[in-house]
Amino acid sequence: MSRIGNKIITMPAGVELKNDNNVVTVKGPKGELTREFNKNIEIKVEGTEITVSRPNDSKEMKTIHGTTRALLNNMVQGVSEGFKKELEMKGVGYRAQLQGNKLVLSVGKSHQDEVEAPEGITFTVATPTTIAVEGISKELVGQTAAYIRSLRSPEPYKGKGIRYVGEYVRLKEGKTGK
């Protein structure tokens, strides 16, 4: 099993962690995140280092231990650096534009799709075919980017649709003629 839970998390300068009965609040230059963790897991802060420990070596505790450490690390990284997912659109007439905090997508449907930015998420449209989703919560950034991609996933014959930057879409061969 992975030993990720035993790794020590180092807090960068300007990041502050408060643990109140396993409800952890992490404050940093980009914002503040709060999350409740399992009562059996112990979270200690010593200077700029955070250690996560478990009471026993049962299979359940080992999994919760690793997950807790990974979530805490993502919180610390989010409030100090933030997270960003970039999407690109391929297809004739496919484009995106911002209207306030709404993302308006034209993706070959009879209507335009509008995506409201959840709290803590910002959209950036550098070119009409590239979208950047940014925020401090890795979970929320990933969910929002996945939702935008799901509005028109890449199809397997021409590759038209919304995809992550750098995502490889395997293309199928078309029908062979007579």
From Swiss-Prot:
PROSITE patterns: RIBOSOMAL_L6_1. GO terms for biological process: cytoplasmic translation. The keyword Transcription regulation does not apply. Keywords: Ribonucleoprotein, Ribosomal protein, RNA-binding, rRNA-binding. One of its GO terms (cellular component) is cytosolic large ribosomal subunit. It comes from the Bacteria. Disulfide bonds: none annotated. The keyword RNA-binding applies. One of its GO terms (molecular function) is rRNA binding. Part of the 50S ribosomal subunit. This protein binds to the 23S rRNA, and is important in its secondary structure. It is located near the subunit interface in the base of the L7/L12 stalk, and near the tRNA binding site of the peptidyltransferase center. Belongs to the universal ribosomal protein uL6 family. This is Large ribosomal subunit protein uL6.
